[in-house]
């Protein structure tokens, strides 16, 4: 198939540091190319891909201090997509909602994966105005706040199986927190859990400008107060395997409707179990007492850390291999692309089809 992947321009594909959406687009694109499809990637000019790259900005917008407004760059990208649209069987958008007016006339050959939270009140009237645009959720939980829209599938994220090495015997005896310093990610909970169990905590996270006050006023004082807490800062892909692989567990103590939580499957790829609070997509990603523990309170989180020895790291990795590889993700999307190309208007959620006996990597037309 001739497939266009349209990525955000904020980070390169794949991102140098933080950037979950761009990382997923990278793994999907590379796997589609590996399977022999003709893939074109619309992304920043510094992106690295096996697909044909259409550069839509010189570099990732977040890394360019001259960029004051990202919207014009994305609109220019959409104009280029519109110009080339007839050359593709499928246009797969990963840029939230900017393209919706454009794709109404192309709805039969487009899909849009929504990567972010959908519970913001401003979004409800917008999505209600576009009930014909085919949408893909990255978890069933992500859909809950939405008005009736044209959901065609749920496709869970996946990663290339060799991107993060399995570690059977971690060299560290620490807990890990990886991602972003923000109130909804609850690094304060991670610090409290580590203090209560008496284990070191390593925090590898970025601090956005929007969260600078939260870091300075809330989290940095806690880091200074507890000698067992080490703040590493933002790490790159090459550092992530060692950081996660040598941890006893990843702490994922969120209290917001996390649409997916890519870091959870990154930890699982390393064989590292996850202790996660029951929010958002967590119950869809973590197999309780298999790849980690799902908890509802600080007391349960502390108990889960004490019970980590019950979990086998080989089983954690096997769960990743069964559920969260890039091949499984690409196969799910290909089933969807083909169903839509064949005129299907609705497709069952991918994992719902699996649970009903359709088998892994399959979508069923509803």
Give the role of each language-model region.
Residues 1-366:
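Catalytic cores of nucleotide-sugar-dependent glycosyltransferases that transfer UDP/GDP/TDP-activated
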